[in-house]
Regions:
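Transmembrane alpha-helical segments of multipass membrane enzymes and assembly factors
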Residues: 68-74
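Membrane-interface interhelical connector segments
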Residues: 28-53
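Short hydrophobic alpha-helical membrane-embedded segments
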Residues: 52-60
Length: 180
């Protein structure tokens, strides 16, 4: 009972954070810049094709957050948000060090590790996974999925950048500044 309450609190907190960040990136709500601003941000990070990575990141946060909140297909939701945090830490925050006040990876690490813990433990008794009898999906599926996500990111990011540099494909043209 206590474990299920703890998992529910973690799911709701972390899931809502990702859901709202994804909504900022997808829809430009809650002070976000929408897909155009997110695309420009990805371009500035050197992630190409930037529009593709903007969509992947925004959907990863939004859909992953929603799945975690609902406790529905929780290992998949946890994989989505963990993947986003891996990229955020590697491309944005790692060079700035650990501390969040200097733009470091501290906050993203907490969110990412919490998502990993949820992926390993499952959503708990108060979840759609439990109601549907899908709780057994959890740990093994998540670990295998995490390895696959890490390998895909390690291959896809450099490959996308190489293709963009050598073909001109993926050089996004922004019609609106990031602040729109």
């Amino acid at each position: 009972m206590v474990t299920s309450i703890a998992l529910l609190l973690l799911r709701l907190t972390v899931g809502i954070i990702f859901l709202l960040h994804g909504a900022q990136k997808l829809f430009g709500v809650l002070g976000g810049h929408g897909l155009n601003g997110t695309t420009q941000f990805m371009e500035n990070l050197g992630l190409r094709p930037a529009r593709f990575w903007a969509i992947v990141g925004a959907i990863g946060e939004f859909l992953g957050g929603l799945l975690v909140v609902l406790g529905f297909l929780t290992p998949i939701g946890a994989l989505l948000v963990t993947g986003v945090m891996l990229v955020a830490i590697a491309k944005v925050h790692w060079p700035k060090g650990f501390w969040n006040m200097q733009g470091g990876y501290e906050y993203n690490l907490v969110l990412g590790i919490t998502a990993v813990a949820l992926g390993l433990m499952g959503a708990g008794a108060w979840s759609l996974d439990a109601v549907l009898g899908w709780s057994a999906l959890s740990a093994t599926f998540f670990v295998v999925g995490l390895v696959v996500v890490a390998i895909v990111l390690l291959i896809a990011i450099p490959a996308g950048n190489w293709i963009a540099e050598h073909s001109g494909f993926g050089r996004d043209r922004m019609e609106h500044p990031a602040s729109v």
